[in-house]
Amino acid sequence: MTQSLTIRRPDDWHLHLRDGAMLEGVLPETTRHFARAIVMPNLVPPVVTGAEAAAYRERIMAALPAGARFEPLMVLYLTETTDPADVRAAAASGLVKAVKLYPAGATTNSASGVRDFDRVRGVLETMAEIGLPLCVHGEVTDPAVDIFDREAVFLERVLEPIRRATPGLRVVLEHVTTRDGLDYVRGGGPDMAGTLTTHHLIINRNHILAGGIRPHYYCLPVAKRETHRLALREAATGGEGCFFLGTDSAPHADAAKESACGCAGCFTATNTLSILAHVFEEEGALDRLEGFVALNGPAFYRLPPNEERITLRKGEPLVLPARIETGAGPVTLFDPGFPLLWHVES
């Protein structure tokens, strides 16, 4: 039985670092294990222009722990006033690696997102021309659509028309939560990929609602039925190159989670690799872990894989704090509900 595994240092292709005191508190949890991350731009105000992305990158670099080797991959927040020329320049400079589509109101800090997709057609056409990926939060915001159906409806109503109207547009369907989303990615050809989170491989909607409300399992897209969770695990561990890790690790202070109207997001940066090693071992797929966390993502983003290696070693249960302290308040770690036996060694 495998007791250790050495792989290329992983990347996180969907990460929330926040800003200010929260950024300073959570950044070390990512840099401890990950070499690069696609950093989400949904700050207040959002990161819309190349200049704003450069300034945010500087703040991230200034907050790095001493000796950390980490490259933030910057993303622009797509709005109806985004300038195609600015997107082109930001991509040409090497600063920006993607543009993020948030349907207005779909998730945390998405009020500036897109309502009229005709108004972003010029940006999308520019992105298709230069090969810059569009990262998509794949949920409709129509209040008539049940929250558990919003991903499947988005594919039909929004994403498919966008892709038909913009040939060559490279798209990442982020944090896929349904079999519908998985099948859409699989059928999308070489310009289509999907990220899978750690927590959606572990929890279904019962974990959030059955026996009491558990706010630290509440995220968007919300976890779905068990049949979808099992399909996600199969996709993550099955060796398909179109799927890769995007944790969507989303820190909120506990006071914002444990309230009458709590924020959406699971904070998984600290223990993601140990959880994933457990999942891949359960599925008899430890040999495919490296592809999921370190190879498939760079291949889609047309970046070289990391040369540095890390080792995961199986041992006694990992002892982690229930929460980390930040200047913005304590942040509770995602609890997978089972002992973590895989330790990460640099």
From Swiss-Prot:
UniProt: substrate binding residues: 16-18, 42, 137, 220, 252, 264
EC supergroup of this enzyme: hydrolase
Family annotation (PROSITE patterns): DIHYDROOROTASE_1, DIHYDROOROTASE_2
PTM sites of type N6-carboxylysine: 100
EC number from the UniProt entry: 3.5.2.3
Catalytic activity: (S)-dihydroorotate + H2O = N-carbamoyl-L-aspartate + H(+)
Record's function text: Catalyzes the reversible cyclization of carbamoyl aspartate to dihydroorotate.
Descriptive protein name: Dihydroorotase
Organism: Cereibacter sphaeroides (strain ATCC 17025 / ATH 2.4.3)
